[in-house]
Regions:
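Acidic, Ser/Thr- and proline-rich intrinsically disordered linker/docking segments
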Residues: 2-17, 23-136
Length: 136
């Protein structure tokens, strides 16, 4: 149950596009865009996206919000460095949250297999908010 999320970012009046196939999680921070594809977490620093170095955080997240359906849960948490992390997670794929070596891990199911993704900087309060959102 993948979906394509298309981003647009205005660069000097030009609107380049990038389509990303998202399986379970899409995470956007002020510096990075992460997404799951084929059961693996992919991460790219913004400046590595060819001509996308001037991507706007608010622009990206607002477009994802418009494209997200009821099947996706939008989480917004603030990490220990006071940076906002936005998670867009398929509701039916969320398994839970785990903690290992001081880092939290989001656990999701992908094709019948449980996978976990480390979320660096996620505070205890932020982790609690994630769990509470899925318990509602």
């Amino acid at each position: 149950m993948s979906k394509f999320v298309k981003f647009e970012a205005q660069i000097d009046g030009y609107l380049p596009e990038l389509s990303v196939k998202v399986d379970n999680i899409l995470m956007v921070t002020i510096d990075d865009v992460y997404f799951t594809q084929g059961g693996k977490l992919r991460g790219r620093r913004t400046q590595d996206w060819n001509d996308y170095s001037t991507w706007n955080f608010e622009c990206i997240t607002s477009q994802i919000e418009e494209l997200s359906t009821d099947e996706w849960i939008d989480l917004s948490v603030v990490d220990s460095e006071n940076k906002t992390k936005r998670f867009f997670i398929r509701e039916d794929s969320f398994v839970g949250l785990d903690s290992e070596n001081g880092y939290y891990k989001l656990m999701v199911e992908h094709n019948g297999v449980n996978l976990s993704y480390e979320v660096r900087g996620l505070t205890r309060k932020g982790a609690r908010e994630v769990v509470e959102t899925f318990e509602d």
